[in-house]
Amino acid sequence: NGLTFGNFCDCLDLLQQSKQAAAEKDESTINEIFQDITLKLYRYKDPEKIPAVPSLLAIHAVNFFSAVWEMVLSGPVYIGGEAIDFRILFQKLASEDRKADDKTGWTGIVFEVAASGVFGNKKEVDDTPFWDVLLYLYKCKFEYLHQKRNKK
């Protein structure tokens, strides 16, 4: 799949916006958001001639994105035959280990990864494949948890 980390972050933001639009029963905004998500997930050969997105494709694109995200949040994902449990990224830390939350969410994470230089600057992080950045975040959290455990 060709999902970039930047498009992943955009899709998550759009999904949140769609929940708000659904609460307001704003069908035209929901349709527009679903179209935007679809265009972030699918690549057209000629970006100058992007066709109107069929509603059925938009619904399936959102369902697929949501299902993959749910898979990441709910259990191990097999990558290269290895079970990677991304849930460690979302576990709450004990209160003594918890840093103040700056409330920047995924945007803040992009800047943190860019600051590390592993994938380059923010634009380059945004253009990096989603799974590469997620694996890097997993590696960082895994190492942090094991360092913490070894200090005790």
What do the predicted segments below correspond to?
Residues 1-152:
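An amphipathic, hydrophobic-aromatic interaction surface with interspersed Lys/Arg
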